[in-house]
Every structure is written in C-alpha cells, then in structure tokens.
Amino acid sequence: MCSSDLQVIVVRQAGGTIVAMINSCPHRGNRVCHADFGHADSFVCSYHGWAFNRDGSLAGVHEEQAFRSDPNWRPESVGLARVAQVDTYKGLIFATFDADAPPLRDYLGDFCWYLDVMLDADEAGTEFLPGVLSSVLECNWKIAAENFVGDALHAGWTHDSGARAIFGGPVKELAGGESYHASVDGHSWEFNLDEIGNAATLADRRILDYLRSRREVVEARLGPLRARMVGAISSVGVFPNFSFLPGQQTFRTWAPLGPTRTRLTTWVLVNRSAPPEVKEAYRKGVMLTFSPAGIFEMDDGENWEQSTLVNRGWVTRHQRLHYGLGLDTRIDHDELPGIVHRGQVNEANQRLFYARWTELMRGPQP
C-alpha cells in the first residue's frame, strides 16, 4: 500500500489481528514486498536475502553465520518497522505513525453515525470489488479533498455536459429543499434526502431497483433519516484525505506527492450481500463516471489542476479566495450530530475542513 512516497505492508495475522509495517528492509532500505495485494507467508529482500515473517520479525539472513559471529548482532531488533497504531471500523483499516494520536473511535467521534450510512446499511457488511484504479493528478491534495467535503455547488456547472449525456438534461437544482452540511472535527458530509440522486448517475436501473427494494430493511437498521441518505446526492470526506460518494460507491484516497502532485487511488465499495449483477453494475458505473477516463472525473481533474497551476505564482498565492457562502446558515438539528448548516449549496464544510487543517498545522511542535 502506497501513501504518498511512503509504502507500508498491511498483513492479517493468523489470529485475525492486523499488522502494518514499513515496506523497507532495515538492512539497506530495499523494498521487500512488490505486490499491491495477495497472500504471503514471508517477505524476502532481493538485495542481501534478509527474510521476514508475516509479523515483520526477522526470519533469517543470507550468510547467517557471519552475523552470528558479530557480538553486537541482535536479530530481534532488526525486524520491519511497525506502524504505531492500527485499528478498524466496520471493515476499514486505519493506521497512524503517531503513537500519541487518539484512539480511532475517539478520532472519528460522532462522525461514526454518518459513516454507518455507507458501512453498516446491511447486516452482511461491505466489501471492495476486485481491482483498483490509480492515477496522478497535477494538483494539491487539499483542493481535491475539499471538493468532497462539501462542494455540491460545482456539480450543476462543471458536470453539465456529462449530465446531459447521461440524463438528456442538466443537473437538477440543488439549492433549497431538505439538505445539509454536517461536520465533526473536519470530517464532513454534505447531502440531501432525495434517496437515489447519486445512484442515478450510474445510469443503471438495476442499482435503483436494488436500493428501492431495500428501503424498509435499511430504515429498520438505521432509522428513516439515514435510510434516505444511502443513495442520495452527497459527498463525504474523512479528515484529512479519504473521500467517498454514497450511492455511487466510489471510495478514494488523496496521497500528496508534493505540493502540486496527488496520487488518487479509487475502489468500489458495495454491500457484501448484493446480487452479482448489482455489484457488476456498480463497477461499470464507477468506470463510467469516477475513473481516470470517467465522465465526471475528467471534469474535476481539469479544474483541480488548473486551480493549482495558476496559483503557483507569488502574487496569486497571496490573493484571498472567497469561502463565504452560507455564513449564516448554522442550525441545531435534533438528529444530526456535529456542526450542522442548512443547505447543500454551501461552503460551511470547506471552512471547517481548513479550520481543522490550520489547527493541526499550528499545533505544538514535537
């Protein structure tokens, strides 16, 4: 698994626990795992033959006798370096190198209530479909991440031609109606309650029929409000850099490769119990819309790259950008956790995303 320029190996152990390690031999730093996924009992460095068990401990070395004769040789101290914390939530694996970071459930907090719309709408749980999409965008990672935390505004303009190609008409008006921005410590969800708006963009009747057939089951599991969010027009960002689109089921991470380059990795997340034909419809739908050659992703990528390109100059980097839409829209809501603003066409979540980023960037230095 690659996150920015750092590669890690994530391995499920025999007892079911999960270990994450740096994909770098502690002898000369060479890569020890070359596969993106699969099964392995050990990892062997091609440079000097150091071998490691699935838990990262040293299994053996080439010319072992030479090392054994060294009085300073401590094989137990030269395993693959561990990631400090690894935890899971509803099948997703989270990890951090910060040993002092809060536990995962504390980090996600009340945002778990929202995440369950995507991760816990079915008793059988979720799974990723086989395959992964990877591409590099010439943009800063934050411009892409902020788009997913709350930018419903761009859809009717940026994606107009794509919508006309799929639906024969423009993106429907999103202003007004029952819609919200919700944010918890930088984690954000913008949505309305139209039930199937996002899912409809995948242009496959089987997906819509599947969602409608499950409405009562989901409502019994999550309640009536969240049941209306499952396929609705919405976008989500878990701070700082992974995003998904409920209904469209695209799940992605934005890994910075520098201030002006980002690696985008995309998966398709579905209910494990969904019929095979529905899973295939989701797979093809994501390829149609949110893949490197997808109708909507090409639109977004062009905007993000141009926004990054023209702001490399000293003068443009110092201009003040307008993030003022919806300043007076904060409300109290009996059911929705976090900081809630009325109206999906808003910039509240973007402001809260950057406020959280600024808070962390200005925090105490180690």
For the regions a language model picked out, list residue spans one by one.
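Short, small-residue-biased leader/transition segments that mark boundaries at the very start
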Residues: M1-S3
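Short solvent-exposed loop/turn micro-motifs enriched in small/polar/acidic residues
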Residues: F43-V44, S77-L80, V236, G247
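A structural signal for short hydrophobic beta-strand segments in well-ordered beta-sheet cores
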Residues: V10, W50-F52, Q85-V86, W254
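Long, hydrophobic, well-ordered secondary-structure blocks that form the structural core
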Residues: V19-S69
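C-terminal catalytic domain of Rieske-type non-heme iron oxygenases
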Residues: A84-P366
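A short loop-to-beta-strand scaffold at the N-terminal edge of the catalytic core in hydrolase folds
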Residues: L6-V11, I18-V19
